[in-house]
Amino acid sequence: VTMDSSFYRQGNIFAVLIVGVYLVLASCCMFYMLSRVMKEKYEKEKLLYISNTDELTRCFNRHAYEERINNLDLREEWIYISMDLNNLKHTNDSLGHAAGDELICAAANCMRESFGKYGNVYRIGGDEFVVIITGNTKEFQSIIESFDRRVAQWHGKLVDSMTISWGYVFSSEKEWDNIYDIAKEADERMYKNKERYYQESKIVRRK
């Protein structure tokens, strides 16, 4: 073995070590950059979730609702359902707000379980909810009947039973001027059902 070949081998080893160190450093940099991108993406998704989610029920909130209805197309087929808990004020006054919260959360769960496959549930006020269904509108009658059964079968720890008034509108019922006319019509139908509930149940409505 000559001295030149020995230097040559040492030079090769040194070159390999340099390349190896470079690759390790490059991999570390790429891993760091990827981790940072993933963390930023997670933080953005977390902020988006918080900004669009109702804290009590984990349904979509009013902010998400406003964004959704502003993107609905009147030329497409969908259903707008306005929903409102009955007797919530009476429950809060007589059993406490923990019982009222139990009702609100139970209502939200029943809505998600019944409508979650077909659309989204929004809590837009204290006991006010909206469901927007964009799929399987032809099966709506069986879906709403299933929802009514689910509500009727519910029993809580603080409250024995729950009733919910609703009113719905198909976007295809007629030509609407805007989305808010549909929302208004659904609200009016819901309030008619609510008045009927109080008349038939003989319960004095608290305002």
Predicted features along the sequence, with ranges:
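A short pre-motif secondary-structure segment
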Residues: 120-123, 160
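Short, hydrophobic beta-strand elements of compact beta-sandwich sensory domains
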Residues: 1-9
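Hydrophobic framework residues that shape the active-site pocket
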Residues: 88, 106-107, 129, 166
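Active-site-proximal alpha-helical element of nucleotidyl cyclase-like catalytic domains
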Residues: 99-118
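Short helix/loop segment flanking the catalytic signature motif in cyclic-nucleotide metabolism enzymes
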Residues: 103, 130-147
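Conserved nucleotide-binding and Mg2+-coordinating catalytic segments in signaling enzymes
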Residues: 45-67, 83-97, 105
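Signal-transducing coiled-coil linker helices
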Residues: 12-55, 63-73
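Catalytic-core segments of nucleotide cyclases and related cyclic-nucleotide turnover enzymes
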Residues: 97, 141-148, 152, 156, ...
